[in-house]
Amino acid sequence: MPRYLKGWLKDVVQLSLRRPSFRASRQRPIISLNERILEFNKRNITAIIAEYKRKSPSGLDVERDPIEYSKFMERYAVGLSILTEEKYFNGSYETLRKIASSVSIPILMKDFIVKESQIDDAYNLGADTVLLIVKILTERELESLLEYARSYGMEPLIEINDENDLDIALRIGARFIGINSRDLETLEINKENQRKLISMIPSNVVKVAESGISERNEIEELRKLGVNAFLIGSSLMRNPEKIKEFIL
């Protein structure tokens, strides 16, 4: 863990380090999220990764049935992102397991992953890939976890928020990068910074815009910049029907 982490982010990483493993047995084959995104792009279909989360440090607090939500999103989304962090997002491994056994589209386990056993859990629970956040790992840790996830046939989504993060992601050979407009420490959104980072990423990397997307015109603007997919959580949790507007 990098020494500079503080506040809720330091707390959530420490909780992740202590989190026990979950006993489960995978019931489905790996379905590649990044490859499905590229298929959507070829067919000119807007690739939305619909996120399921009950709450967040930025203010979301919504209760929806996870199976009902996921089955609805399965008809429109390229994949699902399932928050499994317990304290700050009210997520659970059990929710991920239930969703994975109910849908047949790719699933991203979104958590604060800091150790290999969490990747074991993701695979065993039925997730098809995991989120690795550059900000909460040393470069050596990040590279090791990336290779470990790939040993399962997963291509992790590597999340960045600034140029230093991007440099690290490219150095370790990231093929699938999430550009988060929200600073995880301050929780502030900076869309100009996100757009600048997008312009710096090579065209052969699959790019996902994360956080703060609530309108169709934002998706159109980001697509023109070369974004391949859009991870949307709060907006869809508040109003699931909005995905129909996003994919028009």
From Swiss-Prot:
One of its GO terms (molecular function) is phosphoribosylanthranilate isomerase activity. Pfam families: IGPS (PF00218). This is Indole-3-glycerol phosphate synthase. The keyword Lyase applies. It comes from the Archaea. CDD domains: IGPS. Belongs to the TrpC family. Keywords: Amino-acid biosynthesis, Aromatic amino acid biosynthesis, Decarboxylase, Lyase, Tryptophan biosynthesis. The keyword Amino-acid biosynthesis applies. PANTHER family: INDOLE-3-GLYCEROL-PHOSPHATE SYNTHASE, TRYPTOPHAN BIOSYNTHESIS PROTEIN. It comes from Saccharolobus solfataricus (strain ATCC 35092 / DSM 1617 / JCM 11322 / P2). InterPro entries: Aldolase_TIM, Indole-3-glycerol_P_synth, Indole-3-glycerol_P_synth_dom, Indole-3-GlycerolPSynthase_CS, RibuloseP-bd_barrel. Monomer. GO terms for biological process: L-tryptophan biosynthetic process. Its EC number is 4.1.1.48. It catalyses: 1-(2-carboxyphenylamino)-1-deoxy-D-ribulose 5-phosphate + H(+) = (1S,2R)-1-C-(indol-3-yl)glycerol 3-phosphate + CO2 + H2O.
